[in-house]
Design a protein with these regions (language model features):
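C-terminal alpha-helical cap of glycosyltransferases
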Residues: 351-367
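A short, well-ordered alpha-helix in the C-terminal region of glycosyltransferases
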Residues: 338-352
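Donor-nucleotide binding loops and adjacent catalytic segments primarily
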Residues: 46, 50, 175-178, 183-267, ...
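Conserved nucleotide-sugar phosphate-binding/catalytic loop shared by glycosyltransferases and other
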Residues: 3-8, 27-76, 81, 162, ...
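Active-site-proximal region of nucleotide-activated glycan assembly enzymes
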Residues: 32, 42, 53, 112-176, ...
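Structural loop-to-beta junction motif characteristic of Rossmann-like glycosyltransferase folds
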Residues: 52, 116-117, 265-266, 283-291, ...
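Acidic donor-binding loop of glycosyltransferase active sites
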Residues: 93-95, 251-254, 262-277, 284
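Glycosyltransferases and closely related glycan-assembly transferases
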Residues: 83-96, 104-119, 132-140
Length: 367
């Protein structure tokens, strides 16, 4: 089988694609893959490092206000459509799968027009503009949250709940009991992990600094991941405050988030779709702080999917400070029954066979 995959821009589009590709390769080592992305997206480094063939097309996103840039976007779409058609014709895929990002539009549009089975995978609880555009053309629409069904109401017969392949990958990962020691952490107390995504969050870092004295007194320990860009500033600030941290570990980033999650008791984080899939796959309780800087405020909608099921609580960024952060953590960590219930609710939301479900759809489409 020959599988062409397209998706890019952010890790939330790329890692689910790689998880699915890895799974399909395990099931059938003869499967051939081609990944189509952009030169500027993260996929241009991540995908080749993962060992997959990679080709690029030139595309840019739509500016949501009236702008002459959208004429350039339209031009890029037209030219990239013909480039995508050439790539598809040359590779001769049995199926084409899009995991989101603007690069998917010309690739899946071309494949659909050529009569090749196509699947889009929507990770969020609000559909992205590219997937909305492609919904009419594709064979199947795979989703991770029930809330997104309304965005595909016209195409309900195409919609299939699959979950996110990243969840299956995490659920099958083996816990490494030596991991914490390898990054300088002793599991003497329960661990609260705070992180603001791959680039970190200025407001979350500021709230952490405000809460330093309180965190030092707690019966749980705090691991704060600042993001590489903020690390020196936070470290220097802690030094200038003459703080000797006994109950807190500050790290710029974590290379193996899977192992960190598996050794954590509570997570405080943004509510990107892939992060939520990881939390529910592992059954972790969480405090979600949606980024207000994303398209259509979709992270708040993502968070509500867990909050409504009592698998997480939420603090809006405008309400976030040291006091509110500590208070919310204490409400969960100081109530064992509450923490356990949230963990069970989180686990119940997890779909841990997403790649298997997608494989079934693929085989139903590839005759």
């Amino acid at each position: 089988m020959r599988v062409l995959v397209s998706g890019g821009g952010t890790g939330g589009h790329i890692y689910p694609a790689l998880s699915l590709m890895n799974y399909l390769k395990e099931q059938d080592p003869s499967t051939e893959f081609l990944y189509v992305g952009t030169e500027r997206g993260l996929e241009s480094t991540i995908v080749p490092k993962a060992g997959y063939d990679f080709k690029t097309i030139k595309i840019q996103g739509i500016v949501r206000s009236l702008s002459l840039e959208n004429f350039k976007t339209l031009w890029y779409f037209c030219t990239s459509y013909f480039k995508a058609k050439e790539i598809v014709k040359e590779f001769k895929p049995d199926i084409v799968i899009g995991t989101g990002g603007y690069v998917c539009a010309p690739v899946l549009y071309a494949a659909a027009n050529m009569g090749i089975p196509t699947i889009i995978h929507e990770q969020n609880s609000l559909a992205g503009i590219t997937n909305k555009f492609l919904a009419r053309k594709v064979s199947k629409i795979a989703i991770c949250f029930d809330a997104v069904r309304k965005d595909f109401a016209k195409y309900e017969d195409k919609v299939v709940m699959t979950g996110n392949p990243r969840g299956q990958e995490l659920a099958n990962a083996q816990k490494d009991d030596s991991y914490l020691a390898s990054i300088g952490i002793q599991k003497e107390k329960p661990i609260v992990l705070i992180f603001g995504g791959s680039r970190g969050s200025l407001r979350m870092n500021e709230s952490f600094i405000e809460a330093l004295d309180e965190f030092e007194k707690k019966d749980y320990q705090v691991v704060m991941v600042t993001g590489q860009v903020h690390y020196d500033k936070i470290n220097n600030l802690i030094t200038s405050l003459k703080k000797q941290l006994q109950n807190i570990t500050v790290l710029p980033y974590i290379n193996n988030m899977v192992q960190m999650f598996q050794n954590t008791d509570l997570v405080v984080c943004r509510s990107g779709a892939t992060t939520l899939i990881e939390l529910t796959a592992l059954g972790l309780p969480s405090i979600l702080i949606p980024s207000p800087y994303v398209t259509e405020n979709h992270q708040e909608a993502n968070a509500m999917s867990l909050v409504e099921k009592d698998a997480a609580t939420m603090i809006l960024e405008k309400d976030l400070n040291g006091e509110s952060l500590v208070a919310e953590i204490d409400r969960i960590m100081n109530d064992e029954a509450r923490s356990k219930e949230m963990a069970e609710n989180s686990k119940a939301l997890g779909i841990t066979d997403a790649s298997s479900r997608l494989e079934t759809i693929i085989h139903s489409l590839v005759k």
